[in-house]
Curated annotation (Swiss-Prot):
Coiled coil regions in record: none
Source species taxonomy: Eukaryota, Viridiplantae, Streptophyta, Embryophyta, Tracheophyta
Organism for this UniProt entry: Oryza sativa subsp. japonica
Keyword presence, Transcription: no
Encoding gene per record: GER3
Entry protein name: Germin-like protein 8-2
Gene Ontology CC, one term: apoplast
């Protein structure tokens, strides 16, 4: 009887683990492919499939020109070119997307998170200082200087950043993300540029600064 109970608990635990794993990332495909029907009025977790008989090679192709430099003339000096399911419908249900990241000298991809994806990141040109911060209560910063050909991984959901420390040369990187639609939350934009704005009282208490500083920060976004 004890042995049977243990076996039942073991099976239940394994099933629970398998179920957790199944919902921890994009759902696994149940067919060869599921090209997203971006025009369908049906709303599901992801996108409904177009008729597979109407699929063509173009559904799995995007002339994204990821070999071409992007404009980094902005406040932070960086540009992210993402190819996800919205640009490439064939990615639907496949659990992956790709991005090119361009950095001006001293350019920054500000602290942000991807709520639905782990990111693996490799430098193609230049040098980048990258890092992520662990969750509460430790909030440890794990960081590294990457050179051409180096690879770094950012765990799903954790705040991370990339910065070009070179004042004279640009940098380029490619990232792959473990979701067809990884999402991005840029921390400063979300906190100080939300719509409608977060109450000054909340931000003043959270950051332990006065209203003048909060107003200054909100004005940037």
């Amino acid at each position: 009887m004890a042995s049977s109970s243990f076996s039942f608990l073991l099976v239940a635990a394994l099933l629970g683990l398998a179920s957790w794993k199944a919902i921890a990332s994009d759902p696994s495909p149940l067919q060869d492919f599921c090209v997203a029907d971006l025009n369908s009025p049906v709303r599901v977790n992801g996108f409904v499939c177009k008729n597979p008989m109407n699929a063509s090679a173009d559904d799995f192709f995007k002339a994204a020109m990821l070999d071409k430099p992007r404009d980094t003339n902005n406040k932070v000096g960086s540009n992210v070119t993402l190819v996800n399911v919205l640009q490439l419908p064939g990615l639907n249900t496949l659990g992956i997307s790709i991005a090119r990241l361009d950095f001006a000298p001293l350019g920054l991809n500000p602290p942000h998170t991807h709520p639905r994806a782990t990111e693996i990141f490799t430098v193609l040109e230049g040098t980048l200082y990258v890092g992520f911060v662990t969750s509460n209560p430790d909030n440890r910063l794990l960081s590294k200087v990457l050179n051409k050909g180096d690879v770094f991984v950012f765990p799903e959901g954790l705040i991370h950043f990339q910065f070009n420390p070179n004042p004279h040369k640009p940098a380029v990187a490619i990232a792959a993300l473990s979701s067809q639609n990884p999402g991005v939350i840029t921390i400063a934009n979300a906190v100080f540029g939300s719509n409608p704005p977060i109450s000054d009282d909340i931000l003043m208490k959270a950051f332990q600064v006065d209203k003048k500083i909060i107003d200054l920060l909100q004005a940037q976004f």
